[in-house]
C-alpha cells in the first residue's frame, strides 16, 4: 500500500472540555494518490477532466499490542477515530495471529464495522494486512471538519492532499512523514520485533 502519511499528535490540538475529544483523533492519517500510480498520460488527463481524481484517505489507530483482553477497546477506538475516512485501520505492533479466539473476534468485529487490521512488524516481509478495510465512497465531512478545526497538522495534511501534483513529488516530501528504513529505526537488530 503506497500511502503518504502524517502523524497526528492529539496533544497539539485545541483543548476541549475533559473527555469530549476522547477517541476523536487518529494516530496517523494517509492518502493514496491512485492516479499517480498510472503510467498512461491520456488516462490521467481524462480522469482530471471528467472525473474526480482517484484518491483514498486512510486513517490509522496504532497500538503496541492487540490481545483478546484489549481487542474490543482497541477496535472500538479505531471505529471512533478512523471511520470518517475512506478506509480505517487498527494497526498492532504485536498481534498473536496464532490465537484463534483473537482472530475470530477480530473477524467478527470486522464483519460488523469494516475497520481493517494490520499486523505491523519491523521486517516488512512479516507485516501483513490481516483484514482489508471496507471502502467507503465518501468521507465523513463533519468529522473531517472537526479534526481540521482542532488540529493544525490534520488541516495541513488536507491542504497537502489538495495541492499534491504527481509530477513534482519532491515538493511534498516535507509535508508528509518520512518513511524510515528499518536500520534507522532499530540500529541494534536485537531490539526489532
Label the predicted regions.
Residues 1-39, 193:
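Acidic-basic catalytic patches of nuclease active cores, encompassing PD-(D/E)XK
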Residues 23-25, 53-57, 84-85:
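Short connector loops at helix/strand junctions that flank enzyme active sites
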Residues 105-193:
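Non-catalytic C-terminal interaction segments of nucleic acid-processing enzymes
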Residues 42-47:
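Intrinsically disordered, low-complexity Ser/Thr- and acidic-rich flexible linkers and loops
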Residues 81:
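Ligand-binding face of N-terminal immunoglobulin V-set domains in extracellular IgSF glycoproteins
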Residues 28-40, 54-67:
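Conserved catalytic cores of phosphodiester-cleaving nucleases, focusing on short active-site segments
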Residues 73-76:
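Charged helix-capping and loop-helix junction motifs
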Residues 66-71, 84-124:
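Nucleic-acid nuclease catalytic cores
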Amino acid at each position: 500500500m503506497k500511502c503518504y502519511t502524517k502523524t497526528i499528535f492529539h496533544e497539539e490540538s485545541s483543548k476541549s472540555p475533559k473527555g469530549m475529544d476522547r477517541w476523536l483523533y487518529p494516530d496517523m492519517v494517509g492518502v493514496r494518490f491512485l492516479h499517480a500510480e498510472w503510467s498512461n498520460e491520456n488516462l490521467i488527463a481524462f480522469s482530471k477532466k471528467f472525473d474526480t481524481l482517484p484518491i483514498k484517505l486512510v486513517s490509522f489507530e496504532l497500538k503496541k499490542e492487540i490481545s483478546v483482553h484489549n481487542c474490543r477497546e482497541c477496535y472500538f477506538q479505531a471505529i471512533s477515530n478512523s471511520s470518517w475516512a475512506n478506509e480505517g485501520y487498527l494497526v498492532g505492533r504485536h498481534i498473536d495471529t496464532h490465537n484463534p479466539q483473537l482472530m475470530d473476534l477480530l473477524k467478527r468485529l470486522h464483519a460488523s464495522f469494516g475497520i481493517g487490521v494490520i499486523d505491523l512488524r519491523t521486517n516488512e516481509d512479516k507485516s501483513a494486512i490481516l483484514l482489508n478495510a471496507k471502502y467507503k465512497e465518501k468521507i465523513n465531512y463533519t468529522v473531517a471538519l472537526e479534526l481540521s478545526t482542532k488540529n493544525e497538522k490534520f488541516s495541513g495534511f488536507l491542504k497537502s492532499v489538495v495541492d499534491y501534483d504527481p509530477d513534482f513529488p519532491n515538493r511534498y516530501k516535507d509535508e508528509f512523514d518520512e518513511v524510515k528504513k528499518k536500520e534507522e529505526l532499530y540500529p541494534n537488530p536485537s531490539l526489532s520485533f
